Amino acid sequence: IAAAVDIWARGPAALPPPRHPRTPVLPVEGERNVLITSALPYVNNVPHLGNIIGCVLSADTFARYCRLRNWNTLFVCGTDEYGTATETRALEEGLSPQELCDRYHAVHADVYAWFRISFDHFGRTTTPQQTRIAQDIFQRLLARGFLLQDTLEQLRCESCGRYLADRFVEGTCPFCGYAEARGDQCDKCGKLINAVELKNPQCKLCRGTPVVTPTQHLFLDLPKLEGRLEAWLERTWAAGDWTANARHITRTWLRDGLKPRCITRDLTWGTPVPLDGFRDKVGPTRRPCRALPAGLTCSGVALPQVFYVWFDAPIGYLSITANYTDQWERWWKNPQQ
């Protein structure tokens, strides 16, 4: 405050010269380097004020503040484009998932440009860089013994010849009896649901009745990381930067003990799992499925497994930066700066 008062009294001549950042913006030795992201907006709809106010606007305000302070600042964001929500919306609009992503990515970019959000780069997750980095992280986890394989019971539609992701199933909520509950959550009572728990389940693609079938999936072995995570959390909590709510939720997870977390899904739209036995896991259909538009054909085609969006999407922050600069690791693997 004293410095601000002093500069105010001395007038504009006392201000440091404005920074003229180079392109691309890269960390500079000896300076304060700030990397800012906001939550990646999902691509299957038109963004509304809640999206912008919820995360984008606050990040933009902070980015502008950092630049005014002459801090070396990079602000990146982009659309999150893989997963079942994209497939579902593509079905509704009669488009392939890629066509849907191309359409709504452009809409998002235009909206944020209209609001003058000061991104240095607004990218997307459906890129070769995303595939390369996500598969590299997967291979590193596999080589270090942090992955395991296990069987899940999952709903399979014999008519479509595919295992059904959570959002491709509707049925009656086992908790409140709501007749249009999704395979991941009930919109009436708000409880999370395992799709196989639904009563009277229906395939959203053909309205057929799916059957419970065992299927192999890959899991992140979180119990192996629990000890190291607890030690790291104690150090970071001591710094005082966590909100009370974030501390409470994290302590609850640790109190109950971490469980292995599934990182794969039987889908067509996502980053492929680069492991034999998961590249072409689902065999040909028994009869043609006419419910799918171009780009989502299932008849007679072997479907690969892809990474579950919760594993894949956070890597989008890295891949979007990598599409901005091939020196992205200087931002993401440089804790000293």
Where do the protein language model's features map onto the residues?
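Histidine-centered catalytic micro-motifs
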Residues: 45-52, 119, 123, 149
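Structured secondary-structure scaffolds
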Residues: 1-77, 129-133, 176, 185, ...
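Cys/His-rich short segments
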Residues: 144-219
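A glycine-rich helix N-cap at a beta->alpha junction
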Residues: 99, 104-120
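Conserved short loop/turn motifs at secondary-structure junctions
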Residues: 122-130, 160
